[in-house]
Amino acid sequence: MDARVYWIWLQNAFGAGSAKPVQLVRRAGSAEALFRGGIGLWSSFTFVSDRELAAMSAYGVREAEAALDYCLRLGQQVYTPDTPGYPDLLREIYNPPAVLYVRGTLPDASGDIAIGVVGTRKAGKAGLRAAREISYELAQEGAAVISGGALGIDSEAHRGAIDGRGRTVAVLPCGLDYPYLMDNANLRREILDSGGALVTEYPMQTPVQRGAFQTRNRLISGMAHGVLVAEAPKKSGALITARYAAEQNREVFVFIGEDTAAFAGCIGLAADGAARIRTAEDILRAFSAQRKSARTALLRQAAENVARPARRVRVVPLSDSAAEAAEAEKTPAAPQPEAGLSADAQRVLASLGGEPKHAAVLEAETGLSAGSVLAALTELELLGKIRSYPGQRFTKSD
């Protein structure tokens, strides 16, 4: 049986965004060995919750095999951490996707510089122009542009790269065949026609769910060597991508077109150490060694990133993601308690104390999925209930 089937089984059991599938495979030796070990082996791992054990038992490989066959019949690529073609940069992050579904052609991280370009959906003229022009210049210099395929800054970044005859990748928060944001259906076709790719960790026919945008954002930064925030107000979801970039030891860049509320998030990032830029050359200068000898330099940077401490970036709550979710198919929200917190947020908050605790620990302690934990943390950040630290660690606020 194709080894990817066992990874799909794991992805089905744990959902998108969890670090546990890769951790389990490392301990078991292979995804197949993990599957064949059965409940006796799985229950020996103390960080796997009872609910996750039940999911591992409930999902079978026949369903996973059918899913793989379906994707391959449609001409899509399915990558797992142990297959050629899986992005090397994603192997570096804490929670790499167990399965990556791809339509089109991914850039070669060992030879191409990749820059994530993100920002608000409701951008003004200055931010939109900067996103398009800088992405155009990046493409002209051979860099790949990674973004989220949404309206606003994302769309301009993709179109700039296409106009520059470069390659661009849209990382989606749903299955590749789900009718997400049909206003951009033509853009997605243009991305493929220009030699780029559509990427997701969600199985086919998966709609946009609560927390999917935040979970997806770690892949935009994870697939890139650096991330540019082209325009972001104080409560933009793009700032979560910047936080991921810092935690993943990626370079963080900001464009500040005006000293106004529209760029308040970018101004805050600059105050916290992000590099302020005006042109693509400002970004590429940070990767000058790679441009001279791409393969050698990029591999050296990957090795250095493992040891380099994460850059501290201030965490701010989301508003753009909430607006995006309103466009998508919604999952009914749980009834809100009197305290004003969702049930998931209550559980996460109850697990936190004065000592920083990693998001993966919160998953294990609460029994929630990675996406649910991330959504709960975002809610708690919005209300000022928690503080965040580099490396996806959190405490209760003072």
Indicate residue ranges for each PLM-predicted region.
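Short, small/acidic-rich helices and loops at N termini and domain boundaries
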Residues: 1-84, 385, 397
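Glycine-biased, small-residue-rich flexible motifs in mid-sequence functional cores and linkers
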Residues: 1-3, 80-398
